[in-house]
């Protein structure tokens, strides 16, 4: 039996789906992280190989019957990383087609259930990716928390901390974030933020979790929080604008989907994003995610079989 394999290689877990050529999912398997940017090459190789061999063992299938394997992972735009990941699969003895793509590409394919369209992702980080009917693709954002990721949870969290400290110093507009952030982090004073930010090994996810505080403050009527969320929505729209213009989609009917806890769970931000989009690109249709990234990898693998 011919089949394809789709793999979503994440920083916290790896998700694989094995499907027939007519998109019937036969099996899915989960393993640990396989992001080459946050795990060692040896660990990524072990996870990917165990994942594939465990799945095939459960199905009783041989690797020779696999028509194509698609792996989507962060940072896979780089040729060097693509080659490293491909070699990991080749070492299993697989001689078929291997497609290594950025994780945004498999998220788009899964979300819309086809390869053409646009996806905006805003969780801890942010990125926009699009592909047109001619097969041209473009991305905007996704440069990481230090130099980019505008409109992400991390971006919102950092802006919230800065606004709170400006309020505390009397050099900025008064905001209830000043006290709400301390309460959320269980800190006694604003001076304690120094230890929290610089010395405690705080993670990007912890900073991004402050989006809940900002959203709560907005609901209470805090104007500073409202501006932070609206600015995040505008930044996400600008990433879409860049992709739309590069791919010449300005006057075309395009399907767009959104992913990530920030854009999908903060209603005001999502509504403002939609307003920006509808005002500038009324032909763009926004839909909810239809399927997950692992299935998106299946779609891409299958499309490369023809």
Curated annotation (Swiss-Prot):
The keyword Secreted does not apply. Transmembrane segments: none annotated. One of its GO terms (cellular component) is cytoplasm. ATP binds at residues 12, 124, 208. One of its GO terms (molecular function) is N-acetylglucosamine kinase activity. Substrate binds at residues 35, 142-144, 149. It is found in: Cytoplasm. Catalyzes the ATP-dependent phosphorylation of both cell wall (peptidoglycan) amino sugars, N-acetylmuramic acid (MurNAc) and N-acetylglucosamine (GlcNAc), at the 6-hydroxyl group. Neither the non-N-acetylated forms of the cell wall sugars, i.e., glucosamine and/or muramic acid, nor epimeric hexoses or 1,6-anhydro-MurNAc are substrates for the enzyme. May have a role in the rescue of the murein sugars GlcNAc and MurNAc released from muropeptides during cell wall turnover in C.acetobutylicum. This is N-acetylmuramic acid/N-acetylglucosamine kinase. It comes from Clostridium acetobutylicum (strain ATCC 824 / DSM 792 / JCM 1419 / IAM 19013 / LMG 5710 / NBRC 13948 / NRRL B-527 / VKM B-1787 / 2291 / W). The gene is murK.
